[in-house]
């Protein structure tokens, strides 16, 4: 009886506490709902749009309130610092720089004027370049390895030719390296000069194909002319190879060297599958490995700092093997392990790198990108990759290759559908993971029902609101996000260039 009386006496106190809690909850809900309504009505977005209309659109591309488009750009210079690197000033002057921090290089020049005269200096004909035997020609002592490697690739790897009647070299001691090919001379095995220039085009890249292709201009009596009998040749008569200093002739890149190494792989008709998996791990500032992902060190990327990707991204690489980003990651991983375990000289390092690239890079991807490059379709150069970054959780999507067209990277607007799709996939993966974690810890009970009921009620209230328009939308065009159109229908980023196009005001999300 006494316990019952005590219980009845405590009811008012309990009710008073419950009412206080209810008032706090209602107050929080009202404030929260008021802020949400203020944001959802569109007045803040309208003021921001009017303040920023016509400004530059070069900032980061925000997909939504938590996803932004980011990218990582690789620095391949250190990875391939034991390989010669090349660049081109124009269609006639090309350079190969020696490995690492050397100050010398090899210059390749296409010209119509011969630089050799048998009567003025010591000149010998090169009858055989078997095994890179250029001892009599190379008087520099330091460029020998690079020169032998270059000639071997030109003659054996690409051409399978060991002789060239029109090749001359200077043998004067102390005069430096000088080799001249007569591109108009052919031996009994075929038009070696024509094949030589075609192989040089493959090495330098498709963008230098302007001087590959010779046509005859046939004109009729009526004055009409047409190009006929086009061949894979050049109108230049001589290819001159000589040693030179390296005062930064042009911005060199190892990609031409990599293209030379993998060019046979690009034309392979048999596809390989990787036989093993790589162990991805994360390294802290002291170099200790911590499980949980993979970090690119400072030397591997263009800007300073360390960029890490979690295990979910790396797991996709180990599962599918069908992305250029995964190929590049395997090259970095191989390079890192090779540095730790191997002490090789330059030639052995080069041979090992050639075998590793042929064994690691997926044939199907190389073939696909090579065909795209030949067809003038945007292709991947294995250097720059974009990904979607969740600014709240720090999660990333699997990086995709940033395609190249006409020697420059595509603008973000050209692949907007791709990064929007990656954002949606990242959302789905995160929601699925959160749902599985919640189901594993607690079942969907009363708290979940209350939460989803509140979300449903709030959503139905929002549907009844009439919002304020937030931005200009060109009639008949896609949504201009994130372009800030002026009253003349223009944007300073240059994507919308036609003025006075009809537009209408729309609300965000419509």
From Swiss-Prot:
Gene from which the chain derives: GPC
Residues bound to Zn(2+) 2: 471, 473, 479
Keywords: Disulfide bond, Fusion of virus membrane with host endosomal membrane, Fusion of virus membrane with host membrane, Glycoprotein, Host cell membrane, Host endoplasmic reticulum, Host Golgi apparatus, Host membrane, Host-virus interaction, Lipoprotein, Membrane, Metal-binding, Myristate, Transmembrane, Transmembrane helix, Viral attachment to host cell, Viral envelope protein, Viral penetration into host cytoplasm, Virion, Virus endocytosis by host, Virus entry into host cell, Zinc
Source organism superkingdom: Viruses
Keyword Membrane carried by entry: yes
Chain positions carrying an annotated carbohydrate: 75, 90, 101, 112, 117, 122, 133, 182, 218, 243, 381, 389, 406, 411
Coiled-coil annotated residue ranges, if any: none
Lipid moiety-binding residues (N-myristoyl glycine): 2
GO biological process: fusion of virus membrane with host endosome membrane; receptor-mediated endocytosis of virus by host cell; virion attachment to host cell
Extracellular side: 2-17, 54-58, 59-448
Disulfide bonds: 87-250, 295-308, 317-326, 380-401
Official protein name in the record: Pre-glycoprotein polyprotein GP complex
Residues the record marks as site: Important for GP-C-mediated membrane fusion: 33
Function according to Swiss-Prot or TrEMBL: Stable signal peptide (SSP): cleaved and functions as a signal peptide. In addition, it is also retained as the third component of the GP complex. The SSP is required for efficient glycoprotein expression, post-translational maturation cleavage of GP1 and GP2, glycoprotein transport to the cell surface plasma membrane, formation of infectious virus particles, and acid pH-dependent glycoprotein-mediated cell fusion.
Segments in the Cytoplasmic topological domain: 33, 470-510
GO cellular component: host cell endoplasmic reticulum membrane; host cell Golgi membrane; host cell plasma membrane; membrane; viral envelope; virion membrane
Matching HAMAP family: ARENA_GPC
Annotated source species: Pirital mammarenavirus (isolate Rat/Venezuela/VAV-488/1995) (PIRV)
Domain notes: The cytoplasmic domain of GP2 plays a role in ER location. It also contains a zinc-binding domain that allows SSP retention in the GPC complex by accepting a cysteine from SSP as the fourth ligand.
Positions that bind Zn(2+) 1: 57, 483, 491, 493
An annotated Gene Ontology molecular function: metal ion binding
Membrane-crossing segments per the record: 18-32, 34-53, 449-469
InterPro entries: Arena_glycoprot (IPR001535), Arena_glycoprot_zinc-bd (IPR043015)
Keyword Transmembrane recorded: yes
Homology family: Belongs to the arenaviridae GPC protein family.
